[in-house]
C-alpha cells in the first residue's frame, strides 16, 4: 500500500481507536496543537527514544572509527531544564528572530501563517480549497514570536520574565565547559539530549506533525573547524540510515540540502531529512530532522553576545553606545587542543529530530490494509500496522485458545516468563480471530497461542503478524526463537 493511497483520516482514527494518540483535553473540546499519547503511543515514543539513545549514546563505541567517520569520537548525554536564564535566548538570537509572519483575515476572522497562505483553507469558502483567499481582506504580514512567555517567582514583572525553551540545543551549548571538564573527553565529541520543547505555532495542523508541545532528539557535535565539513557529511548520511533501519522506506525519504538563500544566517550548511507524509500532495515531503553545520556561532554567541552577519563574517550586534545589544556570558568557551597546541572555538554539527514526527512517520509507513481468510476461509479485510519489531509497543501477545483445560494457566505462565524481558500482552477474551485482529492493529509482531496440542507436546503456535503464518514452537525454545525473530 503506497503512501499516496493511505488516508490520514484512517490513520488518525486507528490511533484513537487503539490508544496511540488522543486529542489533549478532549472532554473539554480539546486544545489546538496539543496531543496526549495513550498506552500504546507512549510505548511507541519510548521505543523511538530508546532506539535513538542506544544508537547515539550508550551503544557508541569510542575506541574504533565508525564507517564513514573522520575519526573516533566520544558521546555523552545531558538533561537541561525547560526554563533557563532569559539572557540565553537573547544571546542566541531567539528573542529577536524566533518568529513567524502571520496575516489575519478581516472577513472570516481566521489567522494564517504568511508563508502557508496558498495551502491554507478559507473557512468562508464552501469548497474549502486551499489558497482560495481572493475575496478575503487580509492584513499585512506581522511578526509573531513563537516562544511561550512565563514568569519566575511571585512577581509578574518584566525582570521576572522567562520562556519555555523552543529547543533543547541551548542547554547543551551553555553546558559545554561543564561536560568537557567532568567527563574526561576531548574534541571531537557529542552531547545528546531528549526532552520537551514548546513553540506557540500560529496554525498547528496535520495531526501531530506541527504541535505546540513536542519532544526533540538533538545532538550537538563539537569538532575542530578544519574537520567540520567531513563531520557534517558523516552525520547527515548516518541520520538518514537510522530512519531506514527503523522501517521507513528509502523511496519515502528525501535528503534535501538547503540553498544559500534558505539557510539561517549562521549556517555553513543545512540538510533536511524529509518524509512523504500521506497528508501531503504527491511529490511533497515534510521535515523529519534537520542536520545543520552551525560553525562557531553558538559558542561565540554565549561568549560574546548576539551575533549578526556582516558580509562574510559574524559580528556582535551593537547598540547606539557601541555595547553588545544582547551580551553573552563573558565566559571563555574556547578549546585548547593538546595534540596540536592550538586554541579555537569548536564548530558544531547538529542533528535535530522530533520524537512525535518520527512516531507519526513510522505509523504512516506501517499502516496497511489487506485481506486474509477467517476461520471459515472467507477473505476478510484487516488493518495492520507493520511496525519494525524494535519500535513496536507490544512485542508479543499470549492467548489461551479457550478458557479451560488448563490452557489459561499455561498461557499465563508463558506470559509471566516473557514479560521479564519484553513488553508482552495477555488476552483470553473473545474469539481467537478477533484477538489476532486487535494485535494486528496494535502493531504486535507475534502472537503466541496455547491450544489443545500444547497439553500433549508442550508446543505453542507462533503467528507472524505480517504473513499470518503459524509455526509450532517448543515452549522451552520460545524465548530464544522470539529473540531471534524480534532481533532483540
Feature names for model-found ranges:
Residues 1-488:
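NTP/phosphate- and nucleic-acid-binding module
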Amino acid at each position: 500500500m503506497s503512501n499516496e493511497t493511505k488516508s490520514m483520516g484512517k490513520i488518525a482514527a486507528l490511533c484513537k481507536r487503539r490508544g496511540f494518540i488522543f486529542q489533549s483535553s478532549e472532554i473539554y473540546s480539546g486544545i489546538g496543537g496539543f496531543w496526549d499519547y495513550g498506552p500504546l503511543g507512549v510505548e511507541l515514543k519510548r521505543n523511538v527514544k530508546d532506539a535513538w539513545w542506544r544508537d547515539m549514546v550508550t551503544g557508541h563505541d569510542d575506541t574504533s572509527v565508525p564507517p564513514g567517520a573522520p575519526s573516533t569520537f566520544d558521546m555523552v548525554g545531558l538533561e537541561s531544564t525547560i526554563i533557563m536564564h532569559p539572557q540565553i535566548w537573547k544571546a542566541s538570537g531567539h528573542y529577536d528572530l524566533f518568529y513567524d509572519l502571520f496575516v489575519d483575515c478581516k472577513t472570516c476572522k481566521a489567522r494564517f501563517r504568511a508563508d502557508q497562505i496558498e495551502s491554507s483553507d478559507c473557512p468562508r469558502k464552501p469548497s474549502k480549497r486551499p489558497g482560495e483567499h481572493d475575496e478575503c481582506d487580509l492584513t499585512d504580514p506581522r511578526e509573531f514570536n513563537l516562544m511561550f512567555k512565563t514568569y519566575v517567582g511571585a512577581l509578574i514583572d518584566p525582570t521576572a520574565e522567562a520562556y519555555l525553551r523552543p529547543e533543547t540545543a541551548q542547554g547543551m551549548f551553555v553546558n559545554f565547559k561543564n561536560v568537557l571538564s567532568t567527563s574526561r573527553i576531548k574534541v571531537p565529541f557529542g552531547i545528546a539530549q531528549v526532552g520537551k520543547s514548546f513553540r506557540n505555532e500560529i496554525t498547528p495542523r496535520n495531526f501531530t506533525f506541527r504541535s505546540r508541545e513536542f519532544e526533540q532528539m538533538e545532538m550537538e557535535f563539537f569538532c575542530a573547524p578544519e574537520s567540520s565539513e567531513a563531520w557534517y557529511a558523516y552525520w547527515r548520511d548516518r541520520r538518514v540510515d537510522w530512519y531506514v533501519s527503523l522501517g521507513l522506506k528509502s523511496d519515502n525519504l528525501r535528503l534535501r540540502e538547503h540553498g544559500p538563500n534558505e539557510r539561517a544566517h549562521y549556517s555553513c550548511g543545512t540538510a533536511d531529512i524529509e518524509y512523504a507524509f500521506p497528508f501531503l500532495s504527491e511529490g511533497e515531503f515534510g521535515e523529519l530532522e534537520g542536520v545543520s553545520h552551525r560553525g562557531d556561532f553558538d559558542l561565540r554567541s554565549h561568549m560574546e553576545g548576539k551575533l549578526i552577519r556582516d558580509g562574510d563574517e559574524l559580528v556582535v550586534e551593537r547598540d547606539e553606545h557601541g555595547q553588545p545589544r544582547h551580551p553573552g556570558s563573558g565566559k571563555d568557551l574556547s578549546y585548547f587542543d593538546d595534540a596540536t597546541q592550538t586554541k579555537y572555538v569548536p564548530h558544531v554539527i547538529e542533528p535535530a529530530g522530533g520524537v512525535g514526527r518520527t512516531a507519526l512517520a513510522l505509523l504512516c509507513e506501517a499502516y496497511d490494509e489487506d485481506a486474509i481468510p477467517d476461520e471459515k476461509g472467507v477473505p476478510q479485510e484487516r488493518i495492520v500496522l507493520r511496525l519494525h519489531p524494535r519500535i513496536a509497543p507490544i512485542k508479543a501477545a499470549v492467548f489461551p485458545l479457550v478458557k479451560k483445560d488448563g490452557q489459561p494457566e499455561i498461557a499465563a505462565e508463558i506470559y509471566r516468563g516473557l514479560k521479564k524481558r519484553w513488553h508482552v500482552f495477555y488476552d483470553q477474551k473473545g474469539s481467537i480471530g478477533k484477538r489476532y485482529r486487535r494485535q494486528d492493529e496494535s502493531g504486535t509482531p507475534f502472537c503466541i497461542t496455547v491450544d489443545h496440542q500444547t497439553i500433549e507436546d508442550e508446543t505453542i503456535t507462533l503467528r507472524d503478524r505480517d504473513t499470518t503464518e503459524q509455526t509450532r514452537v517448543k515452549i522451552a525454545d520460545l524465548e530464544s526463537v522470539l529473540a531471534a525473530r524480534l532481533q532483540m
